[in-house]
Amino acid sequence: MNAPPTFESFLLYEGEKKIIKELDTKVTNAAIFTINKEDHTLGNMIRNQLLKDPNVLFAGYKVPHPLEHKFVIRIQTTADYSPQEAFMNAITDLLAELSLFEERFKDAIKEKKEGGD
């Protein structure tokens, strides 16, 4: 089979970076971030979070190849807001939302167990 070993989907090799940033020279105030060892799940979540930000003009992602465990996200922002700032804010907001979701989920499970329904 051509499929890479399973561990390659989540283990970073020695010297491999989780996130690589490069400036987009074709568009002003834009950057391209490559996130290694992740897939559509995180890519779509980050893109959706970025699109909630009014200072983000464009946010899109792609997985270059189905056998490569990485995605590339392109972000363009307004002149007074950097793509890196937008990326960091989106991740921070996403972590807060997921934390709230986890808390509510645990509360719902606890309530269900106590209620006996």
Swiss-Prot record:
Q: What does this protein do?
A: DNA-dependent RNA polymerase catalyzes the transcription of DNA into RNA using the four ribonucleoside triphosphates as substrates. Component of RNA polymerase II which synthesizes mRNA precursors and many functional non-coding RNAs. Pol II is the central component of the basal RNA polymerase II transcription machinery. It is composed of mobile elements that move relative to each other. RPB11 is part of the core element with the central large cleft.
> What GO molecular function annotations does the UniProt record carry, in alphabetical order?
DNA binding; DNA-directed RNA polymerase activity; protein dimerization activity
One GO location term (cellular component): RNA polymerase II, core complex
Name under which the protein is recorded: DNA-directed RNA polymerase II subunit RPB11
The protein's UniProt keywords, in alphabetical order, are:
DNA-directed RNA polymerase, Nucleus, Transcription
Which family does the record claim for this protein?
Answer: Belongs to the archaeal Rpo11/eukaryotic RPB11/RPC19 RNA polymerase subunit family.
- Keyword ATP-binding set for record: no
Species name for this entry? Answer: Drosophila melanogaster
